[in-house]
């Protein structure tokens, strides 16, 4: 079988204007960027405001493993197959970060014959949204440091007299806004800035990867430009000398930041190998942010299609939980069905059993032990109220006996249905059975619900997520987190939803604990306010907001060949 990039390159894409027209987008709503992608105006939703919303399908997965579960493959393959059986369907996915592309994970266009094309355009730059987020974010960092410099240099009274602005009295020990770059760069995690006689004061800072920026979460959760502008204005950049928040509005940078992001608020339209529409927009990580594509992309797609298929990052304890308790709460757009992706390899890897048998070889002992992880994720998704469909993403080495066993086991759970998907190898045809089961699930009456009310106390929300969301026995707060909790209450932020930042490699906070962890204590190390995005992030265990490159990063394989073609992109 050809590599993903060769499959993409051999494919002849339809003109993107044709994809848009077939979807129902008119010419005035289309801004073409080259031959294969286009920005779509938010005016679509106004034109089609009276049209009922499409059914929404959310794709999640079991606890992730190094082998890959194929969530994007399933999202794209399901979209292809739904259209093939006559159900007008559009996909909505996140924009990939170049950090993982050049690191270890690779791109995020799907794979095989279930991918968004051209994959190299999707994985590298796209229409520049991530760069816009980086620029807007770093403008705020420059603005807060410049304000600190001038207020310190002149003093509050002279500063106000010379500038006409009120002094905000920034505490240099409490500058919360770091910088961002869209690469994995561990050496920038902790830095000191302001050295030199005319560059200070010196203070601690650091870099996060752009997808960890609160601006990325804001982009994903905003409804329109007005909402974006208001959210940017609420960003807390620092604290003043008496511990009160200083916002982007306070230092006058919110308007300029919004201007930089004005075009980024429009989703980008591309196509699958079958010529099906796919919106790509925003890209917050699911382990450190809320891990879902934008509300705007969903809302536009919901007026143009009959079914919208989107995905949430990592396992159901991560992106799906945040989809349910943060994104749905903001958008009001509830799913009609949820798909849990699983592979035989994932069950074996999540079994917690060490074995000399290769992961792609039959091993019933590990399969049986690992099934508990799938059972947990089915139950986890089911408690939110949407019908659950299990998609078994098939690999070439999977045996019929193993697949039959797994289907029989799923039949004993409270899943609505189960189907094997071979979309990677066979595109729409490979996901035909899955499409039928998912379509049937969307026809079932269901009542979707969140796990908690925002009016619950912060302590109660943390406890609910720990116990009901992860199966923890208790929660512990560090001394730092306790002080932050009291501050959040005092400043009036206690009614915001909670976003747990933790490892995706286990349901618990410990990546080494596989299967279904039980009776553990969830350690909350830090609470971070995201006033613009509208949630409080609780850092659990060891969480990095800036990845590092491994010993053999992906960029070693990437180059330009003699024909000026990109090679080695995965």
From Swiss-Prot:
UniProt protein name: Formate--tetrahydrofolate ligase
Gene: fhs
Parts of the chain that traverse the membrane: none
One matching Pfam family: FTHFS
Protein's GO biological process: tetrahydrofolate interconversion
Keyword list, A-Z: ATP-binding, Ligase, Nucleotide-binding, One-carbon metabolism
Record-level Gene Ontology MF annotations: ATP binding; formate-tetrahydrofolate ligase activity
Similarity-based family: Belongs to the formate--tetrahydrofolate ligase family.
Organism listed in the record: Shewanella piezotolerans (strain WP3 / JCM 13877)
Pathway, per record: One-carbon metabolism; tetrahydrofolate interconversion
Keyword flag Nucleotide-binding: yes
EC class (word): ligase
Catalytic activity: (6S)-5,6,7,8-tetrahydrofolate + formate + ATP = (6R)-10-formyltetrahydrofolate + ADP + phosphate
Highest rank taxon of the organism: Bacteria
HAMAP family: FTHFS
Keyword Ligase: yes
């Amino acid at each position: 079988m050809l590599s993903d990039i060769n499959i993409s390159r051999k494919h002849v894409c339809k003109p993107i204007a044709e994809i848009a027209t077939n979807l129902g987008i008119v010419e005035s709503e289309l801004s073409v960027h080259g031959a294969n992608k286009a920005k779509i105006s938010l005016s679509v939703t106004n034109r089609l405001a009276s049209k009922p919303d499409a059914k929404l399908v959310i794709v999640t997965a079991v606890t992730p493993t190094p082998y890959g579960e194929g969530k994007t493959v399933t999202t794209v393959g399901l979209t292809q197959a739904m259209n093939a059986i006559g159900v007008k369907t559009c996909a909505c996915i996140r924009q990939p970060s170049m950090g993982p592309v050049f690191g270890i994970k690779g791109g995020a266009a799907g794979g095989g014959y279930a991918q968004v094309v051209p994959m190299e355009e999707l994985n590298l730059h796209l229409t520049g949204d991530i760069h816009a987020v980086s620029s807007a974010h770093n403008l705020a960092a420059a603005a807060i440091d410049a304000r600190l410099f001038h207020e310190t240099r002149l003093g509050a009274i002279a500063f106000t007299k010379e500038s006409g602005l009120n002094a905000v009295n920034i505490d240099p020990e409490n500058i919360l806004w770091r910088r961002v770059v869209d690469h994995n760069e561990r050496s920038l995690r902790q830095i000191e800035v302001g050295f030199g006689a005319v560059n200070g004061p010196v203070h601690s800072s650091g870099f996060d990867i752009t997808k960890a920026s609160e601006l990325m979460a804001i982009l994903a959760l905003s409804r329109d430009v007005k909402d974006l502008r208001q959210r940017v204005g609420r960003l807390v950049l620092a604290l003043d000398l008496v511990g009160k928040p200083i916002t982007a509005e306070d230092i006058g940078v919110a308007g300029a930041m919004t201007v930089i992001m004005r075009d980024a608020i429009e989703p980008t339209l591309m196509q699958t190998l079958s010529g099906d529409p796919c919106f790509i927009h925003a890209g917050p990580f699911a382990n450190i942010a809320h891990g879902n594509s934008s509300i705007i992309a969903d809302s536009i797609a919901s007026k143009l299609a009959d079914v919208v298929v989107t995905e949430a990052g990592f396992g159901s304890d991560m992106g799906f939980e945040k989809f349910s308790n943060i994104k749905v709460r903001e958008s009001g757009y509830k799913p009609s069905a949820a798909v849990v992706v699983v592979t035989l390899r994932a069950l074996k890897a999540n079994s917690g059993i060490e074995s000399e048998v290769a992961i792609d070889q039959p091993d019933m002992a590990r399969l049986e032990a690992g099934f508990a992880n799938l059972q947990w994720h089915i139950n986890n998704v089911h408690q939110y109220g949407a019908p659950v469909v299990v998609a078994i993403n098939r690999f070439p080495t999977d045996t019929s006996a193993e697949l039959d066993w797994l289907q029989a086991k799923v039949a004993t759970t409270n899943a609505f249905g189960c189907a094997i998907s071979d979309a990677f190898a066979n595109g729409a045809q490979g996901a035909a059975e899955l499409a039928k089961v998912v379509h049937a699930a969307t026809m079932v009456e269901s009542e979707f619900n969140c796990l908690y009310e925002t009016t619950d106390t912060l302590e109660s929300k943390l406890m609910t997520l720990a116990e009901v969301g992860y199966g923890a026995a208790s929660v512990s707060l560090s001394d730092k987190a306790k002080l932050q909790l009291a501050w959040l209450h005092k400043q009036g932020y206690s009614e915001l939803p909670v976003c747990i930042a933790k490892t995706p490699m286990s349901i618990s906070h410990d990546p080494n604990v596989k299967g279904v962890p039980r009776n553990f204590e969830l350690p909350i190390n830090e609470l971070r306010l995201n006033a613009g995005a509208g949630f409080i992030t609780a850092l659990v265990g060891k969480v990095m907001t800036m990845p590092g490159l491994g010993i053999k990063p992906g960029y070693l394989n990437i180059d330009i060949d003699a024909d000026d073609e990109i090679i080695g992109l995965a």
